[in-house]
């Protein structure tokens, strides 16, 4: 059970919450702050004070005053009208993440909701009632209005949820769990939907997968180095410390550890003086991707604990301030950066695939074919990898450089952060498939070189891989092989745990 405070949630805790189904509870001190902040909202309504989103309309209607008797209807209408999401739903892990992050931001005690609302969100998390949230329709400012409106619907007993492996109406799940829908009161609808939790939840899942994929890329690249009898000197500690990037130094160190007892690597001048960049520059390129990952993690952990709705309430109600913390620009930039960093891992992997299958670049059988000419072997696998990396180049175009005005030009600059976050996740899926192709080719090359000559780590990884796909002894439908390895990498490493050198043993 993880305790939410509004201030301390980490990526590691989100892994447990999203991927292992761990439950949540609220910090009592934080809940007290929620209750105290709510008292401020009640006084604002009682006194008829003009405060945006509490006693006024929204967006362009911010100058329209709302009568006391209409305050509840205002919040209900807000959720109904803003539930304009379209397209396929977010993965269930992402909608679970939205619930967790929305509850966590409310626990900062500046949003003005009743403790009941926070408790309801936590009930959904712990009972695994997850909203069906369409992926498209958010501009990323004022936050993720459309996606979070679909989340808010289920508190009202409306909309759809994922529940016990099925997609059902929210009331089906609430009734089975003995829960009653709630009626939103002043500010609560706005506090539920005005924030960045859709782009951030998708970003968190993307980061978790990206981190593990980056480790996998090092292990697969190490197997390729063996298959091509790469020069180990390029990974010498002195070279990388001379440049000074810690991520580059760390990648080189992990590669050296993986290959320390390999009989397939060569020394400088033994077979050739230098390797091609796709081998020699693995620490420099992969290390740069790790710089991106470290940046993204830092920004996500800030946003996971951020108050992102509007207005915010401070100093016991002395200050009720309309601001713009809902603007998703920080996450939009981070997700666009993640897209570039991960796409490059696929780019360099595809070049290693080419070196494994091109007979002009190695002394392996052409296209790793068992009978070159009669059988094509891995020829079209390289085509598939080339297609994926080209698709990634399109997806990697920054969403955050775009903006379009909305709400009659009141909201005249937006982040497109949710688009960036969604595209980052798509890129990561493509990267994993490219790495799967590289692994299939690297395993085949390793067999040609002699499995007994592989390092302890890569040999173990090879045997695990061969449990998923057999050797290429005849042409067959290789699409199945690629998907099998892809699924194996995702479910055995990127979903469960960080891959380190010893994970393959």
UniProtKB/Swiss-Prot annotation:
Pathway: Amino-acid degradation; L-histidine degradation into L-glutamate; N-formimidoyl-L-glutamate from L-histidine: step 1/3. Keywords: Cytoplasm, Histidine metabolism, Lyase. It comes from the Bacteria. It catalyses: L-histidine = trans-urocanate + NH4(+). Belongs to the PAL/histidase family. Its EC number is 4.3.1.3. It is found in: Cytoplasm. Contains an active site 4-methylidene-imidazol-5-one (MIO), which is formed autocatalytically by cyclization and dehydration of residues Ala-Ser-Gly. One of its GO terms (molecular function) is histidine ammonia-lyase activity. NCBIfam families: hutH (TIGR01225), PRK09367.1 (NF006871). It is an enzyme of class 4 (lyase). HAMAP family: His_ammonia_lyase (MF_00229). GO terms for biological process: L-histidine catabolic process to glutamate and formamide; L-histidine catabolic process to glutamate and formate. PANTHER family: HISTIDINE AMMONIA-LYASE. Transmembrane segments: none annotated. The modification 2,3-didehydroalanine (Ser) is found at residue 142. It comes from Bacillus anthracis. This is Histidine ammonia-lyase. One of its GO terms (cellular component) is cytoplasm.
